[in-house]
Amino acid sequence: LADEYGLWIIEDACHAPGGYFMDSKGKKQHCGNGCFADCAVFSFHPVKHIATGEGGMVTTNSKELYDRLCLYRTHGITKDPALLHEHHGGWYYEMQELGYNYRLTDFQAALGISQLERAKAGLERRHEIVRRYNEAFSGIDGIKTPFNTADVYHAYHLYIIQVADRLGLYNYLHENNVYAQVHYAPLHLMPYYQQWGNRKGDLPIVEEYYEHCLSLPMYPTLTDEEQEYVIEKVIEFVAK
């Protein structure tokens, strides 16, 4: 469809570093490797797998797209001789696009690179936390755990359960110093998008999911004792 209609495919891999899936030929495909998308985007926000304070990354297998992204990153400016329209000396540069300042500082880049050394261990710890959550909530009426399949290695940026009384559980957990969160409010319900005609009821399945989803604490430094406390409080509320 993308080829037929001249569309770009952008893979949102912000929650997926280290994740992979098996394609139809049984080949492992890592998220963001460009196997089906023109480019992929990653986030380096403080709560993501790799953090640089703020920022992100775009990956692509296209040299043409790479050159354009480099322009957008630095105010639309280039000094690459191969891309210049004119040549006036080594100092010369051109503004060829309406770009912005999306440059990551060297300090932030160094911080991100240093975290690559523990990225695998962090991902393994996330899987251990998920296993413990799943085992604890297995068979408990009123708690729906995340769905996954054998051909996918999930990055588990979040651990999201679904419950009937999401607001009640959210409040109960916060009262007991468990900082659960909701991910995410549907975009079509936001005021900005509603001005373009989007309305509640347009996406009923999305809205149904939103009414019941709740993210539990999920980060590599979460201790077993802390997780047991979270589990205890969730089960306490659901059992009421």
Regions found by a protein language model. Name each.
Residues 6, 36-38, 141:
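Residue-level detector of structured alpha->beta connecting loops
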